[in-house]
A protein has these predicted regions:
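Gly/Ser-rich catalytic serine loop of serine hydrolases
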Residues: 150-161
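A structural preference for short, pocket-lining loop segments at secondary-structure junctions
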Residues: 40, 45-46, 63-133, 137-144, ...
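Short N-terminal micro-motifs specific to bacterial/archaeal maturation
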Residues: 52-55, 98, 155
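Conserved CoA-thioester-binding segment of acyl-CoA-metabolizing enzymes
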Residues: 2-87, 92
């Protein structure tokens, strides 16, 4: 059913749970498309697709969701921060950009499957808003939540603007 799907998509990913001990020890982790670093009691998640102005696509979504999960699962983290990495584009070179939404190059080339949108909206974006579900109870009754702050350098277009609506501050 729809409720079961929504609940399942809010559960922490198995690969994030497997990486949690490493993140707890080292305080940082890099994945394809994102990284996470603990700074004091804050976890900073940085979305990174520098060639495409940090646009979201099939290659960056998994890494971003893993980092969101880690920020929510980490017992030493009390607040989470989302930002974009430094980009390569000539006009913005050397500057952080929050994100350009969906990767329009991949969309044009037909490399953005329809189900990607569902996975993005029910996965990492929903987790920013609702937190992580627990397997034994519905998320509206018991979830792992932390406040999120967005650091918006440059711009947030399309899906990145949508992401801002799910973030607390």
């Amino acid at each position: 059913s729809g409720r079961h799907l929504c609940h399942a998509m809010l559960l922490p990913r198995a690969d994030a749970q497997a990486l949690l001990p490493q993140f707890e020890r080292e305080g940082k982790l890099e994945r394809n498309g994102a990284s996470i670093q603990r700074r004091g009691k804050a976890a900073v998640v940085t979305q990174s697709n520098p060639r495409f102005l940090n646009a979201e696509d099939q290659t960056s979504l998994d890494g971003a969701e893993i980092c969101v999960d880690l920020a929510l699962l980490d017992p030493a983290t009390e607040i989470a921060v989302m930002r974009g990495a430094v980009v390569e584009h000539q006009k913005y070179q050397g500057r952080h950009v929050f994100g350009a939404g969906i990767n329009l190059t991949h969309l044009y080339e037909g490399r953005s499957p329809f189900l990607w949108y569902l996975g993005r909206d029910l996965g990492p974006v929903n987790k920013l808003y609702r937190g992580l579900a627990r397997p034994e109870s519905p998320p509206e009754q018991d979830s792992i939540e932390k406040p999120w702050i967005a650091v918006v350098d440059g711009f947030a277009i399309g899906g990145h603007c949508q992401m801002l609506l799910a973030i607390d501050l």
